[in-house]
């Protein structure tokens, strides 16, 4: 799949790349993004103003889309569900992404 990726720290440093489609783990879902917003966080990331961003990274944490695949322990949504996300304010704090401070994943 194609993604606009922040490849390294610093201003711009973005590339349109072909990346592997993720496979959801037991407690994760894969969302096909239909709409996304560009907010201040993304602009600061684009400009290289956040030193905590771990690259490579696909920017964008405000989005909506359709659940394309679910992990085996997911019970609250089904494949085909329409979902939205804003991960900055409410994260589980337990999954691998949260432990790695990759809250947007």
Give the label of every model feature segment:
Residues 1-2:
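Extreme N-terminal starter segment of soluble prokaryotic enzymes
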Residues 8-10, 25:
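Residue-level recognition of beta-strand termini and adjacent short loop/turns
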Residues 10-12, 52, 92, 104:
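Flexible, glycine-rich phosphate/dinucleotide-binding loops
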Residues 11-15, 40-41:
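Short N-terminal binding/cap micro-motifs at the start of the first secondary-structure element
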Residues 21-36, 49-99:
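Glycine-rich beta-strand-centered segment in the early N-terminal region that forms part
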Residues 43, 47, 99-105:
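Iron-sulfur (Fe-S) cluster-binding segments and ferredoxin-like electron-carrier domains
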């Amino acid at each position: 799949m194609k993604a606009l990726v922040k490849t390294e720290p610093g201003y711009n440093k973005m590339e349109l790349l072909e990346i592997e489609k993720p496979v959801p783990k037991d407690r994760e879902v894969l969302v096909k993004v239909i709409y996304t917003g560009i907010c201040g966080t993304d602009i600061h990331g684009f400009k290289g103003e956040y030193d905590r961003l771990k690259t490579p990274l696909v920017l964008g944490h405000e989005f909506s889309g359709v659940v394309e695949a679910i992990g085996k322990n997911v019970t609250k949504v089904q494949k085909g569900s329409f979902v939205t996300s804003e991960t900055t304010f409410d994260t589980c704090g337990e999954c691998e992404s949260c432990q790695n401070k990759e809250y947007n994943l």
